[in-house]
Amino acid sequence: MKKKGIFGGTFDPIHNGHLHIAYEALYKLNLDRVIFIPSGNPPHKTDKVITDANIRYKLVKDVIQNEEKFEVSDYELKNQGLSYTYKTLKHFNEKHKDTEWYFITGADCLMQLDSWKNINEVLSLCNFVVFRRSGYSMEDMLKQKERIEKKFNKKIIFLDIPVIDISSTTIRNKIKNRENISYLVPEKARCMVNKMNLYK
């Protein structure tokens, strides 16, 4: 049985924090691969302006192209309508029946888990993995983890890694203000952002 991670997000743009999380998940969970899945039309961000999905996909693809154990999927980009996690997990479970899936997400999603569509199905289709994010205390995170585990009778895996205080929002604002982002994003992403004149 293979073990693969699904790392979903808007990746607008992908940054060094995303890569750090993916590497940590890969080795701490002993995964065979980590699949980055840029969201097509995330239901929790319908009121926000998001960069074209194909551009976000290309950013991720270019950044990870030489990483043997990373890949990117355009599954959510090809599907019309809102990008629900249960649909994505169902697709990958049906397509790869020899694989045990680990869904990797942040503390912010853990705090909103009750509002997710078909959350019972989500938790039954994967091992749900949560990493810390800035702005969320360890105490609050562990309380929510325990509450969710009791409510849905499912185990949540806590990925114990240092908090990387980088956000795509901060990066977009820095670009808009003509500030240096070279220490926040991979070189390939930075070059593509400049070439396409993104986030200005």
Curated annotation (Swiss-Prot):
Q: Does the keyword section mention NAD?
A: yes
Q: In which pathway does it act?
A: Cofactor biosynthesis; NAD(+) biosynthesis; deamido-NAD(+) from nicotinate D-ribonucleotide: step 1/1
InterPro entries xrefs: Cyt_trans-like, NadD/NMNAT, Rossmann-like_a/b/a_fold
Q: Name the Gene Ontology biological process terms.
A: NAD biosynthetic process
Q: Which UniProt keywords apply?
A: ATP-binding, NAD, Nucleotide-binding, Nucleotidyltransferase, Pyridine nucleotide biosynthesis, Transferase
GO MF terms, alphabetically ordered = ATP binding; nicotinate-nucleotide adenylyltransferase activity
Quote the catalytic activity from the record.
nicotinate beta-D-ribonucleotide + ATP + H(+) = deamido-NAD(+) + diphosphate
Query: What EC designation does it have?
Result: 2.7.7.18
One Pfam family name is CTP_transf_like
Which family does the similarity line name? Answer: Belongs to the NadD family.
**Role noted for this protein:** Catalyzes the reversible adenylation of nicotinate mononucleotide (NaMN) to nicotinic acid adenine dinucleotide (NaAD).
| HAMAP family named in the record | NaMN_adenylyltr
Task: Tell me the NCBIfam families matching this sequence.
Answer: cyt_tran_rel (TIGR00125), nicotinate (nicotinamide) nucleotide adenylyltransferase (TIGR00482), PRK00071.1-3 (NF000840)
- The protein's name: Probable nicotinate-nucleotide adenylyltransferase
Gene label: nadD
